[in-house]
A protein has these predicted regions:
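Short amphipathic alpha-helices and their capping/turn segments at secondary-structure boundaries
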Residues: 60-61, 265
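Asp/Glu-centered strand-loop micro-motifs enriched in Gly/Pro and often flanked by an aromatic residue
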Residues: 39-54, 91, 244-250
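Outer-membrane beta-barrel translocator/receptor signature
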Residues: 48-57, 63-139, 255
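Transmembrane beta-strand segments of Gram-negative outer membrane beta-barrel proteins
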Residues: 20-45, 63-80
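Outer-membrane beta-barrel porins/channels
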Residues: 19-33, 38, 105-528
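Short, linear, compositionally biased motifs with a strong N-terminal bias
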Residues: 10-11, 66
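N-terminal signal peptide c-region/cleavage motif recognized by signal peptidases
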Residues: 13-15
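Positively charged n-region of N-terminal signal peptides that target proteins for export
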Residues: 1-4
Length: 528
C-alpha cells in the first residue's frame, strides 16, 4: 500500500506551479465562452442583452428578456499547436467536449409607475477550459537536469542530503528517502523546495559532491570524514547538454456562476447587478525525459511534477443599457476585481538508469492557502438594431493587469514582477446578426445568421511576451420555432505564446503557435 504523507511549508519562489504570477495571470483572463448565439457574434453583447451569456458581460441584459427562459449549451474544443523548441518542431492536437453554459431567467412585469420590469437570473459558464490544453515538445538543449539540480544543491552541506546519520564515523541511523523529504518541509521560506530538489538529484546520482565521496569509512581520518559531511559544492554527473522531451497534461477549468438582478425603467433604461462566484479546479502533470551521451555513467533521466490546484473567488458587476434612439443602444459595465483564495498540492518523482534507479518520496506537499486579486475592468458597448432584421454590435473592454496583486508579504517579489512585466490591455469585440423571417401558418419564425471578430491584447508590456495578442473570428446560425430556439456556432482564434519548462536554469523558450477551434450547440426554451 502506498504511504502518503501530508505536510505544509511556506511559499517557494522556485515552484513552477500556479504560485507565481504567470499562472495567477492565467486565472485572471477568461476564454470567450457561453451560448452559441453569443459566441457566433464573438461576444459583442454588452448593449444588446436578451441572452444568458450577455448577462455575464452586462447584468442589465436580463431585463431585455420578454419572458422566462431556460437554456443550455454543449460544445467541443480543438486545439492545434505548432511548437518550436531550440530549432526542433512538433505538432500537437488535443480535443475536449463539455457543458459550456446553463442559464435561467425570470423577468417579472410590474405595474409600478416608471419601473416596468424586474428580472432575476442565474447563469453558469465554463470561463477557462484546461482539458484541451495538453502539449509536448522535444529538442536539444545545452543544459540539462544535472545543471538544474546542481543549482539547488550548491551551498547545502552534504550531511543534509545523506540518508545515513553519522557519529564518530559510524552510521547510527538509516533513514528512508521519504523521512528526509518529509522532514525538509519544516524548513522556512524557499529552503524546503530547494533542499528537496537537491535531495532528489543527489539520491539518484545526477549530481555528486565535488569531493568525490558521499559515504564515510571507519578508516577515514576525522578531517576527511568532516570534509565529506561539510561539502557544499557539487558537480553534475552527466555529460553536457541533452536530448529532451517535455510533456504537459492538464485538466480542469475555471467556472463562473452569475447570480443576477436587473430592472427596466420606462422604455429606455436597464440597470443590473451580478454577484459572481468563481471556482478553479486544475490538475497538471509535467513530465520531462532526457537522454545523454553514451559515454556518460547516466544515460537517461525522467523527472515528474504533479500539481493539484483548487480555488474559489468572488466578484460583482454593475451595468446599464440605454436606448439612445429607436435603433441605437449604449451599454456600460464595471466588473470588480475577483478576490481569490487558493490551495495547492504537489508531488515529485525522479529516476535515472544509475545506481538507485528512482526517487519516489511518496509525499504530498500541501502549500499554505494564499490569496490574490485579479484586475477589474470597464466595458463600453454600442449596438444598432435595424428593426427586427439585423443587429450590429461592438464592445470595448479596458483592463490594467498591473492591478493583479498577491495578498501575502511573502509574495512581494511576485508583485514586483507584475508591476514591471504587465500593463494595460484593450479587448475589442464586433458582431453582426441578420434575421430572415419564415412564415409558418399564422406564426412567424426566424432563421438567424451571425458573424464576429475579436481582438485581445497581450497583458505583457514587451513585444516578445509569454502571452501574445489573440485574434479570433466566429460564425453562427440559429432558428426559432415558436418558444424554442436552436443555435450553433464555430469560433477560431490564433495566438503565439512562449513556454519555459522551469523558472530557473532550464529556461529556453518553446514557441507555441496555437489555433483554438470551438463549436457550440445551444437549446433555449420559453417557460412562460
Amino acid at each position: 500500500m502506498k504511504k502518503i504523507a501530508l505536510i505544509i511549508f511556506s511559499f517557494v519562489v522556485y515552484n513552477v506551479s500556479a504560485q507565481n504570477y504567470k499562472d495567477a495571470l492565467r486565472y485572471s483572463t477568461e476564454d470567450l465562452s457561453g451560448t452559441a448565439r453569443f459566441k457566433g457574434m464573438s461576444g459583442a453583447f454588452g448593449a444588446i442583452g436578451g441572452d444568458f451569456s450577455a448577462i455575464s458581460i452586462n447584468p442589465a441584459g436580463s431585463s431585455v428578456f420578454s419572458g422566462a427562459q431556460i437554456g443550455g449549451t454543449l460544445g467541443g474544443n480543438v486545439t492545434k499547436n505548432n511548437i518550436t523548441y531550440n530549432g526542433t518542431q512538433a505538432n500537437n492536437r488535443d480535443t475536449d467536449f463539455n457543458v459550456n453554459q446553463f442559464g435561467v431567467v425570470f423577468p417579472i412585469e410590474v405595474a409600478t409607475s416608471g419601473w416596468r420590469k424586474f428580472s432575476f437570473g442565474f447563469n453558469y459558464q465554463n470561463t477557462k477550459n484546461f482539458d484541451a490544453s495538453n502539449f509536448s515538445f522535444s529538442g536539444r538543449s545545452n543544459q540539462n537536469l544535472g545543471d538544474y539540480f546542481k543549482y539547488f544543491a550548491d551551498g547545502i552541506k552534504q550531511q543534509n542530503l545523506l540518508l545515513e546519520t553519522y557519529q564518530n564515523k559510524q552510521v547510527i541511523e538509516r533513514n528512508t528517502l521519504q523521512d528526509i523529504y518529509f522532514d525538509m518541509g519544516r524548513l522556512a521560506g524557499d529552503r524546503a523546495f530547494r533542499y528537496r530538489n537537491a535531495l532528489l538529484g543527489h539520491y539518484v546520482g545526477l549530481i555528486r559532491p565535488h569531493i568525490g565521496r558521499d559515504e564515510i569509512k571507519p578508516t577515514d581520518s576525522d578531517a576527511d570524514a568532516d570534509a565529506i559531511l561539510q561539502e557544499t559544492q557539487y558537480n553534475k554527473n552527466v555529460t553536457n547538454g541533452a536530448d529532451q522531451r517535455f510533456e504537459r497534461v492538464t485538466s480542469g477549468g475555471v467556472s463562473k456562476y452569475n447570480f443576477n438582478f436587473s430592472t427596466q425603467y420606462e422604455d429606455f433604461l436597464y440597470l443590473g447587478l451580478n454577484l459572481n462566484a468563481h471556482r478553479i479546479n486544475q490538475k497538471d502533470k509535467l513530465s520531462h525525459w532526457e537522454t545523454y551521451a553514451s559515454t556518460s555513467t547516466i544515460t537517461n533521466a525522467y523527472f515528474e511534477n504533479e500539481y493539484n490546484t483548487k480555488g474559489s473567488g468572488f466578484s460583482f458587476q454593475l451595468g446599464a443599457i440605454i436606448k439612445a434612439t429607436k435603433g441605437l443602444r449604449l451599454g456600460v459595465t464595471y466588473t470588480s476585481p475577483t478576490w481569490y483564495t487558493f490551495n495547492q498540492e504537489y508531488t515529485q518523482y525522479l529516476s535515472t538508469n544509475n545506481r538507485r534507479n528512482y526517487a519516489d518520496p511518496r509525499v504530498i506537499v500541501t502549500l499554505p492557502d494564499y490569496k490574490f486579486r485579479t484586475p477589474g475592468s470597464l466595458t463600453a458597448s454600442a449596438a444598432y438594431l435595424f428593426g427586427k432584421y439585423a443587429i450590429l454590435s461592438a464592445d470595448y473592454t479596458y483592463k490594467d493587469y498591473k492591478n493583479l496583486h498577491f495578498g501575502s508579504a511573502a509574495k512581494n517579489s511576485e508583485n514586483d514582477l507584475i508591476e514591471n512585466q504587465l500593463g494595460e490591455t484593450s479587448t475589442v469585440r464586433i458582431g453582426v446578426e441578420g434575421r430572415i423571417p419564415i412564415k409558418t401558418g399564422e406564426a412567424t419564425n426566424y432563421v438567424s445568421l451571425r458573424a464576429g471578430y475579436r481582438y485581445e491584447q497581450s497583458p505583457y508590456r514587451k513585444k516578445i511576451a509569454p502571452v501574445g495578442d489573440l485574434n479570433g473570428y466566429s460564425f453562427g446560425a440559429g432558428i426559432t420555432l415558436g418558444g424554442i430556439r436552436l443555435d450553433a456556432s464555430y469560433d477560431i482564434a490564433k495566438q503565439t505564446n512562449l513556454y519555459q519548462m522551469y523558472e530557473t536554469v532550464l529556461t529556453d523558450n518553446a514557441q507555441i503557435k496555437s489555433t483554438y477551434g470551438n463549436f457550440l450547440f445551444t437549446f433555449t426554451a420559453q417557460l412562460f
